[in-house]
Amino acid sequence: MSFRRFVEIGRVARAVYGPDQGKLVAIVDVIDQNRALVDGPCTHVARKSMNFKELELTNLKAKFPHSAKTGVVKKAWEKDEISKKWEESHLAKKIAAKEKRKTLTDFERFKLMKAKQARNRLIKIEFGKLRKALKKTPAKPTRKPNKKLHKV
């Protein structure tokens, strides 16, 4: 399996540490093997240098030239609809669900537990019905045994 997310000009990343945690930024320039110049004009992140360890690369990419100014980055961001694509992405939905789970009250966690128990009970019942039906009519072998290997 090959990598699909490379550090490149225009690659959109999510800040995972620091004051801009959770905000999206675009890589404007690569400073060295450890740092990049990033800018997030639509997410209110000022242009600054960030360590790659602070960034999580996404599948999104905006097209703009090397070392582009903030205005150019903003136009490319809006043209490629990066914010809209991010909201529709699997990772963004997963992060939103995790945040929602953090804000649940004790009673809401209890209701969730009961709903999961009811769902699992239904699955168990249906699986039992399938198992019972399979025992009544055993499955036929798909191929005949090899006579050379199984001598009687």
Curated annotation (Swiss-Prot):
InterPro entries recorded: Rib_uL2_dom2, Ribosomal_eL14, Ribosomal_eL14_dom, Translation_prot_SH3-like_sf
Any Gene Ontology CC annotation: cytosolic large ribosomal subunit
Key words, A-Z: Ribonucleoprotein, Ribosomal protein
Single GO term (MF): RNA binding
Top-level taxon: Eukaryota
SUPFAM superfamilies recorded: Translation proteins SH3-like domain
Cross-referenced CDD domains: eL14
Pfam families: Ribosomal_L14e
Any GO BP: ribosomal large subunit biogenesis
Family: Belongs to the eukaryotic ribosomal protein eL14 family.
Protein name per UniProt: Large ribosomal subunit protein eL14
Taxonomic source organism: Lumbricus rubellus
